[in-house]
Amino acid sequence: MSAKRILMITGDFTEDYEAMVPFQALMAVGHQVDAVCPDKKAGDSVATAIHDFEGDQTYTEKPGHRFALTATFADIDPANYDALVIPGGRAPEYLRLNAAVLAMVNHFFEHDKPVAAVCHGAQLLAAAGVLKGKQCSAYPACQPEVELAGGQFADIEVTDAVTDGNLVTAPAWPAHPAWLAQFMTLLNR
């Protein structure tokens, strides 16, 4: 396996596990991961939220940790990266309004580079217009957005993931083992 440069686009109130776990896991196997957020610099941090599934009609939300950013968003050239990771949580709700973020997402699809999105990360994919004809899993409340963007919503178990071409998606953090394994396969192709 050759080490890859992976970009993680995140923001305030990203889901704690969905940022921290892949960030650390991908580095643990030798990849370089740069975590960025618009209007923030390397050394800044984003607030995270812990989403849990406790038997209510939707997930619960609790304060998470501070997640340190490792690169400056304004300095990023997506051409210098081999893959993209988009954690879920609240951040994709507002990141999808940022034209520079959408342009970065589009770069990875235009160049057929591996992309992973978890949970509400599908909102960013839908806004970028990259889901047409693709299977995409996400938190179930994102199904209308996936379908309105021309994607095929993959209604899978919360512990599963789906790969369609260069895209790996999962409904939420319980699917980390599944989506990380599928993403690693794409990284090694």
Residue ranges of model-derived segments:
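Extended, subdomain-level signal for the structured scaffold at the beginning of enzyme domains
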Residues: 1-111, 124-135, 143-189
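Short, thiol/selenol-centered motifs that function as redox-active sites or metal-ligating centers
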Residues: 118-121
